[in-house]
Amino acid sequence: MSFNTNETDRLLSTTRSVKKRLDLEREVSEEVLLDCIEIAEQAPTGGNQSSRRWLVIRDPKVKKEIAELYREMGGQFLKEQSERLDGTGHHNEKTIKASSYLAEHLEEVPVLVLVTIYG
């Protein structure tokens, strides 16, 4: 198998986080989820310590509770910033609007994955 470094560089330099275009109806298989966690495990850690634990949440009630906490802690700020920047062309306008959208719809995502670090 060949490795295309140009394509890798292109992907790493053009791929941004996706918040507004999430497919909230699409299920995430266990296989895909585990593949994503496996890839994320390759990220460096301080002192090369493996101190991460992954919490996978599919339960709608738990997702709703987490979403409510998330909105309680920062949702109002995101909403206010989104309204303040709307139509200004500010370089953070799209990011804040997308973050505000995600905060409003967080419990609708098929699965939440929280990474914890201990030590």
Where do the PLM segments sit?
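Short secondary-structure capping/turn segments at boundaries of alpha-helices and beta-strands
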Residues: 38-44, 53, 100-101
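Alpha-helix boundary/capping residues
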Residues: 15, 40-43, 69-73
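Specificity-determining recognition surfaces
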Residues: 1-35, 42, 49-50
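A generic secondary-structure signal marking the coil-to-beta-strand transition
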Residues: 8-10, 53, 109-111
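Short loop-to-beta-strand entry elements in the cores of soluble alpha/beta enzymes
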Residues: 47-58
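General N-terminal targeting signals
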Residues: 25, 29, 35, 45, ...
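Glycine/small-residue-rich phosphate/adenosyl-binding loop
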Residues: 56-119
